Design a protein with these regions (language model features):
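Ligand-binding "clamshell"
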Residues: 125-136, 284, 298-310
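Short helix-initiation/N-cap motifs at beta->coil->alpha
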Residues: 58, 95-107, 122, 244, ...
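Gly/Pro-rich hinge or "lid" segments in bacterial periplasmic/extracellular proteins
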Residues: 3, 18, 22-24, 29-89, ...
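Structural transition elements
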Residues: 182-224, 245-247
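Ligand-site clamp/hinge motif
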Residues: 81-126
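Alpha-helical secondary-structure segments
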Residues: 11-17, 21, 61-62, 91-93, ...
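Ligand/substrate-recognition segments at binding pockets and active sites
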Residues: 70-72, 215, 219, 223-294
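Extracytoplasmic/peripheral linker and loop segments enriched in polar/acidic and small residues
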Residues: 1-2, 6-7, 172-173, 207-212, ...
Length: 310
């Protein structure tokens, strides 16, 4: 513990000594995505069931879970009276409904069963003039993960061909229509600024050439890759989640790839998110359509994913 530079000054005070400056340290300490204080006795008493139900889950924020089951389609939260700022919390609770069909979600919203829904595709056009409609960036990136242990995907030219042969602008404007923006990079605009007030994107540059949309260049890379592999065709399975938006993007990618890369066949595998994650973590997939969101306001929340062994 001494080597870690942490000290319990009293029952409610933690003192941390840093080896180097960290501008976002306070944020990290308060972010549930990074550090969570847990009662050791409680965690040990739950054994392997910790955090699998409302009774085996602790909370130190404004709300606590009152109803939750891993397979349930609803999660219910109630106000946490032990929260230090409980007097400032105006809601008695929050209820989350898991609805994969956006049309069903919109109908529930119109019926008064939901207060907030996320829209994509044609539903955006239906509601964009509605005063209740608003758009905001959440910093999430959708991206493709090729399994480089699979034959064909272990070839860099094949991977580059896949990356350059689909139109990101069309995905955002014709498929999603939800305010998403095309990116040829991974750290999004608006995440973090430096000491000069410059956005990270301004300071770091805007794109990686190997990701930019260029069908002719993609075809040349594809031809080169097939030659290196000694093949004239390849077949891959694209794995995606069972939400409307994920399936729509996957279908668009399937069409783009098959139209732009001669000899390529793409099959779609649609799974619930939990199953998709399990298969991808085990390496049982070809190409995965997945996403990542920032845990804190610093480029490293995105960049440290690409360090070997991370």
């Amino acid at each position: 513990v001494e080597e870690l530079g942490v000290e319990a000054a009293d029952d409610k005070t933690l003192v941390v000594t840093l080896s180097s400056p960290c501008a976002i340290f306070d944020y990290l300490m308060a972010s549930g995505a990074c550090f969570l204080p847990l009662n050791q006795k409680f965690v040990e008493s739950c054994g392997g069931n910790f955090a699998t139900s409302a009774d085996t889950l602790l909370a130190d924020g404004p709300f606590k879970v009152s109803s939750y089951e891993p397979s349930a389609m609803k999660v219910e939260l109630v106000k946490n009276d032990q929260f230090f700022g409980a007097s400032d919390v105006k809601l008695d609770g929050v209820e989350f409904s898991i609805i994969t069909d956006s049309q069903t979600a919109a109908l529930s919203f119109e019926n008064g069963d939901l207060d907030v829904v996320t829209l994509s595709g044609n539903l955006v056009e239906q509601y964009e003039d509605d005063p209740r409609f608003s758009t905001r960036s959440d910093g999430y990136n959708w991206y493709l993960t090729p399994n480089m242990k699979k034959e064909g995907l272990d070839n860099v030219n094949i991977r580059k061909a896949l990356a350059k042969s689909y139109d990101k602008e069309a995905i955002t404007t014709r498929v999603l229509k939800d305010g998403s923006t095309p990116m040829d990079y991974f750290v999004p605009q608006g995440l973090a600024t430096n000491e000069k007030g410059e956005d990270f994107r301004e300071a770091a540059g805007s794109a990686y050439d190997s990701w930019t949309y260029d069908v002719e260049a993609a075809k040349e890379l594809w031809k080169t890759g097939l030659g290196e592999l000694g093949k004239d065709s390849l077949s891959f399975t694209l794995m995606c989640e069972d939400t409307d938006s994920a399936q729509a993007v996957a279908q668009f990618l399937q069409s783009e790839w098959q139209n732009n890369l001669p000899g390529l066949t793409i099959e779609l595998q649609v799974l619930p998110k939990k199953a998709r994650l399990e298969y991808m973590q085990k390496g049982e997939y070809d190409i995965g359509l997945t996403r990542w969101g920032p845990d804190y306001a610093d480029p490293m929340t995105d960049l440290d994913m690409w360090i070997t062994g991370s």
